[in-house]
Each structure stands twice: as C-alpha cells, then as structure tokens.
Amino acid sequence: MKLIIFTGLVLFAIVSLIEAQAENEKACLPQYQVCTDAPGNCCSDLVCDCYGRYKSGARIGRNCFCLQKGVIYKRED
C-alpha cells in the first residue's frame, strides 16, 4: 500500500515538472512579428519596440514589433 502511494506521488511530481517546463518553453515571436499584446514574447536576441501612430497630430494608435537589439531604424523619404 505504501509503495502504491509513493509511486503515485512520484508520478504526480514528474507530471507537474514536465508541465512547468513546457510552460517556460513558450514559442517566441520571430523578427518583425507584432508584439503589441505580448511585449515579453520576442525571441532572446530581439526586443519589442513600440511606435505611436499619428494622424494630423493626433495619436491614433500604437504598433509594436520584435526588432534586433541595438539597431536604430530611421524613416526614409
């Protein structure tokens, strides 16, 4: 009886550990993917950069993208 209880507890611990590890290994967002709703999900070599959208001087929204760390993007006309 003790062996059955011990085995059950060990199996429960193993399943819990596997589920916790799978939770930590969520798929990350690749470069140029939208991260507005998930700013912490960009892959490790990327950062979630956000930009405001304006029309006639009034802010109309915000866009966020997974971009390379340390890279500066400039608008070209």
UniProtKB/Swiss-Prot annotation:
Residues 21-26 form a propeptide. It is found in: Secreted. Contains 4 disulfide bonds. Transmembrane segments: none annotated. Its main location: secreted. Residues 1-20 form the signal peptide. Expressed by the venom gland. GO terms for molecular function: toxin activity. Keywords: Disulfide bond, Secreted, Signal, Toxin. The keyword Secreted applies. One of its GO terms (cellular component) is extracellular region. Pfam families: Toxin_35. Belongs to the neurotoxin 19 (CSTX) family. 08 (U8-Lctx) subfamily. This is U8-lycotoxin-Ls1u. It comes from Lycosa singoriensis. The lineage of its organism: Eukaryota, Metazoa, Ecdysozoa, Arthropoda, Chelicerata.
